[in-house]
Amino acid sequence: MTEKKYIVALDQGTTSSRAVVMDHDANIVSVSQREFEQIYPKAGWVEHDPMEIWATQSSTLVEVLAKADISSDQIAAIGITNQRETTIVWERETGKPIYNAIVWQCRRTAEICERLKRDGMEDYIRNNTGLVIDPYFSGTKVKWILDHVEGSRERARRGELLFGTVDTWLIWKMTQGRVHVTDYTNASRTMLFNIHTLDWDDKMLDALDIPRAMLPEVRRSSEVYGQTNIGGKGGTRIPIAGIAGDQQAALFGQLCVKEGMAKNTYGTGCFMLMNTGEKAVKSENGLLTTIACGPTGEVNYALEGAVFMAGASIQWLRDEMKLISDAFDSEYFATKVKDTNGVYVVPAFTGLGAPYWDPYARGAIFGLTRGVNSNHIIRATLESIAYQTRDVLEAMQADSGIRLHALRVDGGAVANNFLMQFQSDILGTRVERPEVREVTALGAAYLAGLAVGYWQNLDELQEKAVIEREFRPGIETTERNFRYSGWKKAVKRALAWEDHEE
């Protein structure tokens, strides 16, 4: 009898590193998770220690195999999914980072972005990379590191320094520096990659003065990139066979592989992606055009809207405002009041993402009267997640010309029934919550498993996509539109709050 085989997904997120073991029926066998430190050197700056990312991720891999009581020779393949855009530069020789990882949320490169706009680069960037000029993406972060670490640009030119997003960093460490690769989905988030020619863009590299020698090789999201022998008992070399940025992995894990299928992930931020097939749809409504995975991990395109603050705004209620002691309590308190009593919370703590793209917006609470209590504010904070999702969905429907009939949802906050019902109410659309919530890890596992023949094709996976609960709209159109118009008014007043040089 042959030994049972499994797939491991490594899910390197913004606040924690996780490892998930899955069996052939896409059941979760074991999970290991470790949080790591968030570093805030200045207001609006966010960093991680790349060595801590590696330490937490590698230890979860060892731990998850021990928990499942399986040896490394029972692992058919490893798939990697990661927080996107987060930028690491390290020495080729030693594997040591020259600076902390600059995280996707970090706004320190706003001035570099203003300069790109002044240089008339907006249309070029939108047309060739699919992105908008914003500190969110990796390109300006790489430039910042090269500008601020003495001698680094010259070293990069000599081939002594390497750049990578988190996937690239992990694979470099897992293969002891033998493999320097990324996949199309992660490359498409750097603002350095041409999504039409599927190659690094020389004009962008020149504009940001980034030597091409630093950049990883870009490969498909489902193929064998290299082998690793990390991971507990048994010294087998395990193929690393799938890579996708977290949102594209979730889209694949939800099996949204056909044109017009969409999902929203409610994590630290909120991310809605709609697969547009083999056609790159240019957005006229502040969305991103990005690369997604087709049925076999090949290049498809997607429209994406990013909301920076979703679960993070609930953490704010807990950690800074001390209104709740546990994120799960937010649902209980929100349902203790019948509405928000006219209050809107705009959680623009680090600016606003799609479709506004205003790094100078700041958080605000509007509509406060004497009768407002903490429950109203908790409820309004939860509702803000649903309103921001509607902002994005409206833009998507306008760009693609596709009316969405159902939204698939995943991420930590989907356990909140109040939020899911309000989401359906405010969209006027069915919201489908899957049985397996770990869709990001699932996507990475599927991509890796397909690459090594563990699963033959997506048809094999379709029956595993069980919808656990469907939420349907429960309010009238007039009420829906009235509430949403209040949100629009609140956002308008939060825009451009921080002064900046014109």
Curated annotation (Swiss-Prot):
Query: Which range is the signal sequence, renumbered to this chain?
Result: none
Lineage of the source organism?
A: Bacteria, Pseudomonadati, Pseudomonadota, Gammaproteobacteria, Enterobacterales
Q: Where does glycerol bind?
A: 84-85, 136, 246-247
| Gene3D superfamilies to which the protein is assigned, alphabetical | 3.30.420.40
> What InterPro entries does this protein map onto?
ATPase_NBD (IPR043129), Carb_kinase_FGGY (IPR000577), Carb_kinase_FGGY_CS (IPR018483), FGGY_C (IPR018485), FGGY_N (IPR018484), Glycerol_kin (IPR005999)
Quickly give the catalysed reaction.
glycerol + ATP = sn-glycerol 3-phosphate + ADP + H(+)
Q: What class of enzyme is it?
A: transferase
Q: Name one GO cellular component term.
A: cytosol
An example Gene Ontology biological process: glycerol metabolic process
Activity regulation info: Activity of this regulatory enzyme is affected by several metabolites. Allosterically and non-competitively inhibited by fructose 1,6-bisphosphate (FBP) and unphosphorylated phosphocarrier protein EIIA-Glc (III-Glc), an integral component of the bacterial phosphotransferase (PTS) system.
Give me the residues that bind ADP, please.
Answer: 14, 18, 268, 311, 412, 416
Source organism per entry reads Citrobacter koseri (strain ATCC BAA-895 / CDC 4225-83 / SGSC4696)
- Protein's name according to its UniProt entry: Glycerol kinase
Any one GO MF term held by the record is: ATP binding
